[in-house]
C-alpha cells in the first residue's frame, strides 16, 4: 500500500479534486468516474458523492493508495 499525506489549505477539499491533485486520477472526469463506480472509500466507507467535503483527519483510499488529510 502506498501512503500519501495531503495538507489542507482551507477548511475542506472536494473528493474529486483531491484525487486529481494527488494524481490518483488522470483527470477530473476520471476521478468522478472512479467515485461513481464505488472505487473510493472515506474513513472505511465507500463514497459515491463526487463533491464530498474531505476535512483534516479523514483517510481516503483508492485501490492500494491511502491518503491521510491533515
Predicted feature locations:
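A detector for short, charged/polar N-terminal pre-domain segments
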Residues: 1-13
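A positively charged, amphipathic N-terminal helix/segment that binds anionic biomolecules
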Residues: 4-5, 59-70
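A basic, amphipathic helix-loop patch mediating RNA/tRNA/ribosome contacts
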Residues: 10-56
Amino acid at each position: 500500500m502506498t501512503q500519501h499525506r495531503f495538507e489542507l489549505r482551507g477548511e475542506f477539499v472536494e473528493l474529486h479534486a483531491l484525487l486529481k491533485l494527488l494524481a490518483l486520477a488522470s483527470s477530473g472526469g476520471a476521478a468522478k468516474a472512479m467515485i461513481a463506480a464505488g472505487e473510493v472509500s472515506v474513513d472505511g466507507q465507500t463514497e459515491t458523492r463526487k463533491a464530498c467535503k474531505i476535512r483534516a483527519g479523514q483517510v481516503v483510499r483508492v485501490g492500494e493508495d491511502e491518503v491521510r488529510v491533515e
